[in-house]
Amino acid sequence: MRKRDRHQLIKKMITEEKLSTQKEIQDRLEAHNVCVTQTTLSRDLREIGLTKVKKNDMVYYVLVNETEKIDLVEFLSHHLEGVARAEFTLVLHTKLGEASVLANIVDVNKDEWILGTVAGANTLLVICRDQHVAKLMEDRLLDLMKDK
């Protein structure tokens, strides 16, 4: 199966079922006679723009552009390696390759307090409206990250 067709199949599966692990996705692909390695599947998920959300004590994959409105700070806290602040800008450190996916989620779910994002490979800049908002977000992120 071609990559484009495989991506379409994965998107279809994600919209029809709440799949929590790459293994579940891989098993569903195999049921459609599509065999992929874990490495290929990871790359596919990143290219498609899938991320995990936690809702009602369930964790499952969703397409980034189809995420429901979420508690952005709580969501980010589950995906960050570190947080720093420079005046009105938050510097969020992620695992390699996750910053751009998280930037898309922030952009889809942002409110009037967030102006925009800039993403690198493992660093996400969140530009807040002012220093006060950045400080509030930083404090809440650090609090939530302590509990992980």
UniProtKB/Swiss-Prot annotation:
Give the pathway annotation. Answer: Amino-acid biosynthesis; L-arginine biosynthesis [regulation]
| InterPro entries membership | Arg_repress, Arg_repress_C, Arg_repress_C_sf, Arg_repress_DNA-bd, WH-like_DNA-bd_sf, WH_DNA-bd_sf
The record's listing under Pfam families reads:
Arg_repressor, Arg_repressor_C
A single GO BP: regulation of arginine metabolic process
Main localization is cytoplasm
The places in or outside the cell where this protein is found are: Cytoplasm
The Gene Ontology terms for molecular function here are: arginine binding; cis-regulatory region sequence-specific DNA binding; DNA-binding transcription factor activity
- Gene Ontology CC: cytoplasm; transcription regulator complex
Q: Which UniProt keywords apply?
A: Amino-acid biosynthesis, Arginine biosynthesis, Cytoplasm, DNA-binding, Repressor, Transcription, Transcription regulation
HAMAP family named among the record's database cross-references: Arg_repressor
Name the protein family.
Belongs to the ArgR family.
Q: What does this protein do?
A: Regulates arginine biosynthesis genes.
Protein's recorded name: Arginine repressor
